[in-house]
C-alpha cells in the first residue's frame, strides 16, 4: 500500500537555496537587488502596485469585503444610520438629542441575541460622536465608518473598537451605510450630510433599495435647507415622493416614528420595545 506523502519533503527542490558565490562571485549582489525589487514582491504585498490607477477596482472590492467580513463576524444584520454635521459641539442642543437617540437604540438592542439593531455613523465628531456616545452610554455596540481625508479625521472614542472602519472611497462607504439600514436619522448638517441624505432618498425613490423610514430631525432647519414642495411644483418629483421622509424634534419621537413605521408594515425591528 502506497504511503501518503509526508508534510515535509525529504529532499530539497531545485532553487530552494540561492546560487552559491563559489559558482558565481557576482551572484550574491545580483540576488540582493532582485529580492529588494518591487517587481519581485507578491502582488498582495506590493503597496505600490495596489495603489496604482489600474488596481482601483481591486481596492473597491477590498473595501467592500473587509467591512462586510467584520460586520458578518459580529452578526450585524440591522443598522439605524445617523447622519449630521461634524461641526456641532457638545453644547449644541442637537448633540444632546443625537446622544439620547443613540442611547434609546442601544438600550433597545441589549441582550437580544443574534441580529440586534445597532447605531451606525460616519465615525467622526459632532453628531456622529453624539450618536455613538449614546450607544456607548447604554453599553451597546455601535459602528463607525470613517473616511480618509486630506487632513486626518480621527474616529470618535465611542465607536466599538472592533467595529471602527476606515474607508478610502466615499462610494463604498455610502454603500455600507445603505446595505443594512433599517432607518435613517438625519440631523442638521452641510454638504456631506446633504449628499448622504439625498443618496438614500434617491435609492428609495427608485426602489433600488427597499424604502426605510427617513427622519429629519429639526423641521425648522430642514424647511430652510431644501424645499421639496418647490420641487413638486416644478414637476421635478411626484407627490408620493414627499412621503419618503418625516420630521421629528426629539429623540423619543424619532425612535417611536421608526418603530411604528416598521410595525405598520408587519416587520418590526428585532429589538425590545422602549
Regions found by a protein language model. Name each.
Residues 139-152, 187, 201-224, 239-240:
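Short, acidic/small-residue loops that bind anionic groups at enzyme active sites
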Residues 216-274:
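C-terminal functional extensions of proteins
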Residues 115-118, 211-213, 242-245:
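Residue-level recognition of the N-termini of beta-strands and the immediately preceding loop/turn
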Residues 11-20, 28-29, 34-37, 43, ...:
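Glycine-rich beta-alpha loop segments
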Residues 1-9:
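N-terminal acidic, proline/glycine-rich, low-complexity intrinsically disordered segments
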Residues 136-137, 199-204, 230-233, 262-263:
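Short, solvent-exposed amphipathic alpha-helical segments in soluble enzyme
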Residues 72-75, 111-113, 136, 156-159, ...:
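Solvent-exposed alpha-helices and their adjacent loops that cap or buttress functional pockets
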Residues 121, 125-187, 191-194, 198:
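Phosphate/pyrophosphate-binding betaalpha-module
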